[in-house]
UniProtKB/Swiss-Prot annotation:
Family: Belongs to the cystatin family.
Keywords of the record: Antimicrobial, Protease inhibitor, Secreted, Signal, Thiol protease inhibitor
Domain of life according to the entry: Eukaryota
Main subcellular localisation: secreted
Membrane-spanning intervals of the chain: none
Residue ranges of coiled coil: none
Name of the protein in question: Cystatin-9
Triggers of expression: Up-regulated by bacterial lipopolysaccharides (LPS), in some cancer cells such as promyelocytic leukemia cells (HL-60) or myelomonocytic leukemia cells (U-937).
Signal peptide span: 1-28
Molecular-function GO terms, alphabetical: cysteine-type endopeptidase inhibitor activity
Gene: CST9
Length: 159
């Protein structure tokens, strides 16, 4: 015979166990180029728009004077949301390699702006958490859950 407290704890224990399995999934640390371009996600127009949104958000929130530009997509994957509200919607996750440019953040043509020349690489590594956005894009730019770009960690410093 189990106590009422044990019965209440069982659903929580089960949900923690199920969420723990999601953490066991690991992704290869190789770029899309090294994977032979087999990943079709990087060609998806919605993924490209999401990358552009993430890069723009990073530049807007960054305290740096100069803009960052995409160097390459290190890895990417599409996730299925467990949340009932977002079920069936597109959720992209990605690891991007960014590099600082000579252009200021709000100049018109950042896409064609050259990278800064320096002996020290200025790539950054950052964990940024965007709200789960579905394909219509209606939640893009709402700012909920976005990480602060000023907390970016210089990737190559201290090595």
């Amino acid at each position: 015979m189990s106590s009422p407290q044990r019965r209440k704890a069982m659903p929580w224990a089960l949900s923690l166990l199920l969420m723990g399995f999601q953490l066991l999934v690991t992704y290869a640390w190789c770029s899309e180029e090294e994977m032979g371009g087999n990943n079709k996600i990087v060609q998806d127009p919605m993924f490209l728009a999401t990358v552009e949104f993430a890069l723009n958000t990073f530049n807007v929130q960054s305290k740096e004077e100069h803009a960052y530009r995409l160097l390459r997509v290190l890895s990417s994957w599409r996730e299925d949301s467990m949340d009932r509200k977002w079920r069936g919607k597109m959720v992209f996750s990605m690891n991007l390699q960014l590099r600082q440019t000579v252009c200021r953040k709000f100049e018109d043509d950042i896409d064609n702006c050259p990278f800064q020349e320096s002996l020290e690489l200025n790539n950054v590594r950052q964990g940024i958490s965007f709200p789960q956005v579905h394909s219509c894009g209606c939640c893009m730019g709402c700012g909920v859950g976005t990480g602060a770009a000023d907390k970016a960690i210089p990737r190559d410093k201290g090595k």
